[in-house]
From Swiss-Prot:
One of its GO terms (molecular function) is large ribosomal subunit rRNA binding. Belongs to the universal ribosomal protein uL10 family. GO terms for biological process: translation. Forms part of the ribosomal stalk, playing a central role in the interaction of the ribosome with GTP-bound translation factors. This is Large ribosomal subunit protein uL10. One of its GO terms (cellular component) is ribosome. The gene is rplJ. Keywords: Ribonucleoprotein, Ribosomal protein, RNA-binding, rRNA-binding. Signal peptide: none annotated.
């Protein structure tokens, strides 16, 4: 029979995991409390939190959400989970930047919007620009050909108007001179 405190802790972890749109698993062995506090301070403004978890309890919680995914590999050794409630790519970038400064922080992998990623894939995803930048690039890519098309269709009409305007001005000059 599980202890009530552990049941409650599993439920808390489950709720955090359920509310997050991304979970990033890291190993923090060797990092000081000050280092972890600094890391938490960097990701807090990005709508994320970094928590050290007990592997068995976290695994019980995550199996409720992803029962068919092989996630045991993320819960070996000291584990911390970054819960991302906003844009996960900004948080990933902050974590990767922090890991460059603090080599003891190791990525284990992650789950982003329901997809499981390895440690290397998580690091690659961190290289992507933020969602807003990607969206603006897509809009730009879509609108550029349309703008060219509009200009191409408008050009002959503009040329005709300019020609007619030039003819009208020329006739006006001739009528003034007579």
């Amino acid at each position: 029979m599980p202890k009530p405190e552990k049941v409650q802790k599993v439920e808390e972890l489950y709720q955090k995991m359920l509310n997050a749109n991304a979970l990033i698993f890291t190993e923090f062995k060797g990092l000081s409390v000050a280092d972890l506090t600094q890391l938490r301070g960097k990701i807090r403004p990005l709508n994320a939190e970094y928590r050290v978890v007990k592997n068995t309890l976290a695994l019980l919680a995550i199996r409720k959400i992803y029962p068919d995914k092989d996630l045991e590999k993320f819960f070996v050794g000291p584990t911390a989970i970054t819960y991302c409630y906003g844009d996960p790519f900004g948080v990933l970038k902050a974590l990767v930047d922090y890991a460059k400064e603090h080599e003891l922080l190791k990525f284990k992998g992650g789950i982003i919007e329901g997809e499981v990623y390895s440690a290397d894939e998580v690091k690659e995803l961190a290289k992507l620009p933020p969602k807003e930048v990607l969206l603006s690039q897509v809009v730009g890519a879509i609108s550029a050909p349309l703008s060219s098309l509009v200009w191409s269709l408008k050009w002959p009409v503009n040329k005709l108007v300019w020609t007619l305007d030039a003819i009208a001005k020329e006739k006006e000059k001739i009528s003034i001179n007579q």
